[in-house]
Amino acid sequence: MCWAAAIPIAISGAQAISGQNAQAKMIAAQTAAGRRQAMEIMRQTNIQNADLSLQARSKLEEASAELTSQNMQKVQAIGSIRAAIGESMLEGSSMDRIKRVTEGQFIREANMVTENYRRDYQAIFAQQLGGTQSAASQIDEIYKSEQKQKSKLQMVLDPLAIMGSSAASAYASGAFDSKSTTKAPIVAAKGTKTGR
């Protein structure tokens, strides 16, 4: 009768092991999918940051070219003013004022170019920073939502606990007793006296 009680215990242990194996595979698949998603988010963020860096570089080159052009115009204008003043033989505060006004105009234009570049760069930098922080928080959430695998010891002890519990309940019900409390019916056997 011992084997009749041991079979369900063994089956429950096998089911527990099978369930743990299926759960471990599911957790591993979810973890792998989460990590692939995190890598894709990081790749997209890197591409976006590279694109924004190229935009910032382009804005810098545009501003540099515009400043170079303005400096050339300034040199020509100041040279023309000096030549005109020299040819007219005029001197004094009025002539100095004409030079200062012309220089001030070029300085204001150069400052506008510089300010426009700074504004564009700040917008690009804010986009890079926002994209990077958003990606970091998404990746952090992916890693926080990962389920943890059971330890190897836990994977061994859980089925043993289930089997031990089944064995204890079977023992308590008397399934392992060598003397059975129920008698087998021999009524159906031919030629056997039943004592009636």
From Swiss-Prot:
Q: Which domain of life is it from?
A: Viruses
Chief location of this protein within or outside the cell = virion
Instruction: Identify the keywords attached in UniProt to this record, alphabetized.
Output: Host cell outer membrane, Host membrane, Membrane, Viral genome ejection through host cell envelope, Viral penetration into host cytoplasm, Viral short tail ejection system, Virion, Virus entry into host cell
Task: Report the GO terms under cellular component.
Answer: host cell plasma membrane; membrane; virion component
Q: Membrane spanning segments where?
A: none
**Pfam families, A to Z:** T7_gp14
Write out the annotated subcellular location.
Virion; Host cell outer membrane
A single GO BP term for this record reads:
symbiont genome ejection through host cell envelope, short tail mechanism
The UniProt family comment states: Belongs to the T7virus internal virion protein gp14 family.
Q: Output the HAMAP family linked to this UniProt entry.
A: GP14_T7
Q: What does this protein do?
A: Component of the cylindrical core that assembles on the inner surface of the capsid during capsid formation and plays a role in viral DNA ejection into the host cell. The inner core is composed of stacked rings of gp14, gp15 and gp16 proteins. Following binding to the host cell surface, the internal core is disassembled and gp14 is ejected along with gp15 and gp16 into the infected cell. May form a simple channel spanning the outer membrane.
Subunit details: Interacts with the portal protein. Interacts with gp15.
Output this protein's name. Internal virion protein gp14
What organism does the UniProt record list as the source?
Answer: Escherichia phage T7 (Bacteriophage T7)
